[in-house]
Amino acid sequence: MTDPTKRRMIGSTVPAKVREYYNQGHQCLLQEDWEMSVLFFSRALHLDPKLVDFYVFRAEAFIQLCDFSSALQNLRRAYSYDPGNNKYLNRLAFVLYLQGQCLYELCDFQEALCVFLQASDLQPQNASFSYRCMACLLALKRYHDCLALITREVKQGRASADVYILRARLYNFFQKAKLCYQDLRSALLLDPLHAQAKGLLQKMVDQAKQSLQDASTLAVQGKVHRALKCINCAIENNPLDPNFFFFRGTLRRRLQQFDHAVEDFLKAMDMVTDTQDNLVKQAQRQLLLTYNDFAVHCYNHGAYQEGVLLLNKAIRDEQNEKGLYINRGDCFFQLGNLAFAEADYKQALALSPLDEGANLRMGVLQEKLGFCQQKHRQFQTAEEHFSEAIRHSPQKPQYYLHRAKCRQFLQNTLGARLDVATVLLVNPEYPKMAAVMNTLFPSMTVENVLKSQVAELAKLQLSRMIENGPKNIYPQSTVVQRLLERRKAQVLVKLWKQERLGTPEEEVTLYQAPQLAEEKKVKTARRRTSLTDSYADQTSSGSVFSIVSISTSGPEMSTSQEYKSSSHTAIEFSESTLLKPQLSVPRKSQELTWSPKVVQAVTENLIQNATEVTPAYGQRDSKKATQVPKPKKTEDPKDPSQSTSTTEAPEGPRPSKSRSTLSVKERIRRAKAVRAQGWKLKAQRSSQKVTKTPSLTHSTTHSDIGESANDTPGQTPWPSKAADSLSFSEISSTDLSSSESFLELTNLLTQEVQQIPGDREKLTSDD
């Protein structure tokens, strides 16, 4: 049993000893006697373990002795007794930092990392601990862990310029140039004068230029995929250069990556500055080409509606590109919107009238429109569509065959024959011609048809249509029109000056035979073209073909008279198919030279008077040129050689007619014949060959085509309506003077224009 007195003495002496150890330890701290200080504080804590301050004092002594582990143990013990004291926590974190830094300097990066991580856990808001952890991870080459730690710091909003630069270097190491560039931009925003950021940025720009050069080389070599990888690397190193996106867009367009190509071009256009107008134009052009190629891709895969939408975008920005209209017209054609397709093809032809592809497509479209109208029995409209197709593609025989069938329904037999003859001219072995040949040319072979006069006329029309081509269908540009007008004015001035100087002219009359015209060309060393020639050359034959008055000799007669339609078919004469009027004037009578207006009036007058109605087969023509009818003898033809009408001029003198009894047409012909006789006498004098022989003219006029004047052997045929006109060789030049004939002709032209409607009505009533 313990003495109570002794217990009381022990209890009173323990606090005194603790106080004594405390004073001695504190004195040693002041004297920097770290070991004795640790000894005294340890004795005091042995007497009373709950003295928290003594742990802190002993930890300070251990810190000075660089015994960080012991210091950490004492600080943790103190913090465990008083968790709310932040001073203990801050001191503990500081000791951990010192320990980690010492380990880092000793290259013990793994232990240093563990220490820094402990300090960072104690004070997460302290960025210095995280930075030291990053350094340890980099030293350990744990780049992914370091990048994750940096990303965590950036997300927490504690990133600085150094942090961005550190992560940029990591991205550059991982070849993530795009992210590297972004971090450099962020670092420069925080510190515009950061030297390391500027240096690294310049390095990336140089890498981008090198990648662009490599991509260009590979693209030229045809290695498009590798070139695309290089240009992607260039964009990652310098994503603010619009040239890189433009180049990548072109590569993607070649690889048919149209969506990405459009994005690149749009991005390049957004990134350009005011000084890069050329790049903007190139990007717009490439964007249009991308839309067009994308539309073609959709067209090939049957997505016609999508192709139309893409081409609408392209045409909205570029209205002068014919290829866009052609492609959109193809899409409309496949969708069945023929009206829209026709409008697009017309627009393309207006931009380029000679474009072969546009003309070919227009021909196919017009053919389909013609089939649609023909199906609805609208043969007149179908004929117009087929004629339009022929104007665009005159060498396609199927168009002529389709139009010939339409003209058969319209009872235009002559036009159908011309079309069939044209088909044989273009392709003599064209299939499916037997039925049409039997209908329009019965009992005739292909060779006979090709030798006929209808074939000659069809050949003439075909050659003119091919020569003219589609260039006259659509209006020319303003510049071309002005150039043509200027040249025409220069030619007119030159001709006017030559007329003032008295330059002789040798011209051929309206109804002179082609053989005589060729002989005159051989005799004439230098021939001058009249002003009306240019007008006649510019006319192009339309859907209604015309007939030329072709004179034949002897056995060569027109085969078009052997087969006649049972209906009344209107036969029209066009100015383009008539022989060109050329009138000669001697030098002594220059004041009587016909002006171009008079010549043109004569031509138009004759064209209007040339329209006649072909009677039915076997019927008699009842038309009358004068009040007294002319007797005729007609019989049914026995063979094709007897079906032609021959007009002969009588050898004996003709009974003279007064001017009052002559009709208007006969008076015009007579006046022209007088002038032609004067020209002929002049030609005979120059050649010094005066011969007088009775002329026998065989001419096929517009009235002869529509009638059947066949004579039996042994009978003399009555003169036809064409024979009633005066022959050039039988009229004396003394009947009318040149001046009187010219004035009379001028007056008659004026009267004829006014009397033509009445005469036509009169003829119609007589029929």
UniProtKB/Swiss-Prot annotation:
Segments annotated as TPR repeats: 18-51, 53-85, 93-126, 128-155, 208-241, 242-275, 288-321, 322-355, 363-396
Pfam families linked: TPR_8 (PF13181)
InterPro entries reported for this sequence: TPR-like_helical_dom_sf, TPR_rpt
UniProt region (Disordered), positions on chain: 612-733
UniProt KW keywords: Repeat, TPR repeat
Coiled coil location: none
TM segment ranges: none
Biased composition (Polar residues): 684-718
Full protein name: Tetratricopeptide repeat protein 16
Organism in which the protein naturally occurs: Mus musculus (Mouse)
